[in-house]
Amino acid sequence: MNVIQKVFGTHSERELKRIEPLVKRIEELRPSMQQLSDAELKAKTEEFKKRLSEGETLDDLLPEAFAVVREAGKRVLNMEHFRVQLIGGIILHQGRIAEMKTGEGKTLVSTLPAYLNALEGKGVHIVTVNDYLAKRDAEWMGEIHKFLGLTVGVVLNSMTPEERRAAYACDITYVTNNELGFDYLRDNMVIYKEQLVLRDLNYAIIDEVDSVDRKSGSTPLIISGQSGKSTKLYEICDILARQMQRGEDMEDLSKMDAIMGVEREETGDFIVNEKDKIVNLTAQGVEKVEKFFQIDNLADPENIEIQHNIILALRAHNLMFRDQDYVVKDDEVLIVDEFTGRIMPGRRYSDGLHQAIEAKEHVKVKRESKTLATITFQNFFNKFDKKAGMTGTALTEEKEFRDIYGMDVIEIPTNRPIARKDLQDAVYKTRKEKLHAIVEAVKEAHAKQQPVLVGTITIEASEELSRMLSKQGIPHKVLNAKFHELEAEIVADAGVHGAVTIATNMAGRGTDIKLDDVAREAGGLKIIGTERHESRRIDNQLRGRSGRQGDPGESKFYISLEDDLMRLFGSERLISMFNTLGIPENQEIEHKMLTNAIESAQKKIESNNFGIRKNLLEYDQVMNEQREIIYKERRQVLDGESMRDAIYKMITDITESKVDMVIGDDTDYDDWDLEELNSLLLPIIPLAPVKRGRINKPKKNALKQQLKEEAVKLYEAKEAEFPEPEAIRELERVILLKVIDRKWMDHIDDMEQLRQGAGLQAYGQRDPLVEYKMNGYEMFDEMTENIKEDTVRALLHVRVEQKVEREQVAKVTGTNKDESAVKAPVKRMDAKIYPNDPCPCGSGKKYKQCCGRKA
């Protein structure tokens, strides 16, 4: 702690002092609340709503409202909020992040600000990390709100849009971050206002805010549909990838060295950079690919797909590992969430990586998907008028929360002092020695009936340890992605005396591990970490499973110099130093230098990851501004506003811009290229061809005026063809929605391509982000021009035959996060026609050159 903190206290301590008087007022109201009957306590809700309507603010009501919830908690659940929980509630109401240690009852804390903010009637979302917690909390904590007369809803993955709409219409809604984000994206793809499920985004309380930020900070939410690409190329590239030789890693050759011209001899066909998870072809590798595909130059634009796919195949073989990153089950590749160790059914890697892994594992390669809508969690949560977060570990990331969400983190003291002992890390030379030591430690604890929880990073490691324990005859349970149905039970039993539980990264959070008396006597829950995780937060989470509410406990991490963390980020010097010391086998190395090296490796990785997320966010910011514009326009169309004026403006804009494109301000009348003007304008607005004979005045502005008037008359004539004026208004909305959606989906794809290409700009001494922004804005302008042209073209060429129906541009086939997997999709009855198939109309042409063109 530095001098300034000693004198003035930390940021959290100063803020807690400021809140102190509020907490006192809530506590002083306790006796008067206890005297109220149930009916009188319930009547408080209506009284508060009335006071709000008469001009009081939520802050005015806070002490009394919190006191009411506190009393209701005691009556309904027999749980009265502790003082520290009241503090947490105030922090959350203020739109900040409350850091509370595991087992301090975060779930109960959220009832306070949720009740207070729900009084406005605008809705409150309590966001959890999985369906199980959302359902549990809604049923459990929901009792308090229902007792006080508020409605409580829960949104689960299996629900229909009707059920979701009803849940979101409640005063308080429990929902997972994925469901909420996807519902927002889906709401921006609906074609009738009645199909919307969400209300405006008012106030969100995000549970485990750090895990939403981390886990998904670098993977945005994606809704996808199928693209028409063939899957053969993946299988061919997989065959080639197996024949290619991996070269020596160019570990120390950084980009800086590359720019400074430091050279090292390349070896092999490709080089893998494990730190940044990148694969690059060497010159020899490029030659091999060209020879295999019989092409002259791999870098040619028409070969970009081959280049992309061979890199994917090499990544699948060298950076993606079975039973660590994914599992193969029932002829399917399923992703394993690296942070929780859970399988995520229905989620797929994007950009073709999933197909490359399918080819590697010889299972059926599914068609590639096309992104229809996407958003990052950070940008999504920033759309709420107010947001707050709860977590057990956020201070390590406080800078990030300030930078990205503009929220500060307040550390809330524990209700009882922590009695857990966190021991120094034990370091061994090799992995084998480390595992041997872990088994010995488990054996020793088991002999004295002390419960043990062993945390591993991969499924493989958990199974290996399980085999070693079985050999020693130690009964135990394993919890990893393969068995996650039993999760809650296994976690709940982990505190029984003599229990040994092995878990991958399990957070398994949300379920408390309760000790029995014998276990408490034996020293409480012993936590063993089998290696340090890249993120200190996950290490702290594992530690925090023990010692809740003042329980005894201990934690210790076992590390070997061969662990990934030490191998990739530890220093070579350190390792060689211990090698020269000649340490005997199975000897534990304890050294301050080692502990520091581990801490600094973790800090290095964290700042690296923060950089990646911040970078992603800066790129997404460009998309975000564009998304806002498109979604706002879409919403206006949905809200049933008349688009008549907008359409007329489009018609006049197009006319003006086409004249401007062909005729310069000082071009002589004789030099006007009318043929060019007709070829640009008439396909969109079918006027009579512009010839010199029918131009009223040989002035550019006069020509613009004349053509605009003709175009407007043309549209008025089209309007007159419709017997009911509302019919053409609806047609305008239908066409606009269709065009906006189709163009926006293509634009998302183009922007993704642009972003991947932006990295190459770095070598051209240009800032990739600046290039991306400039090009992105140009592409957006081009897209809006195309939307105008396509809309006007469609409206002016439409024939009045039957009532128009709105329809979705693309069918959603899936999402990229587990809980939101679309369950059984509706199968199409007729076979899908691909662009190169013969046209079903019988003309003998390819579909894309016949009916496909019209489609």
Mark where each language-model region is.
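Conserved P-loop NTPase motor core
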Residues: 1-582, 631-632, 653
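A generic alpha-helix preference that emphasizes hydrophobic side chains
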Residues: 4, 66, 171, 354, ...
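Generic detector of ordered secondary-structure context
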Residues: 61, 302, 349, 393, ...
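Active-site-adjacent structural elements in folded domains
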Residues: 110, 438, 824-826, 834
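Extended, charged helical/alpha-beta scaffold domains that provide interaction surfaces
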Residues: 326-334, 340-347, 549-550, 557, ...
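Short, Lys/Glu-rich amphipathic helical modules
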Residues: 448-462, 639-640, 692-696, 840
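Hydrophobic, well-ordered secondary-structure elements that form the walls
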Residues: 454, 502, 744, 780, ...
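A short, cysteine/histidine-rich metal-binding "knuckle" motif
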Residues: 831-837, 842-855
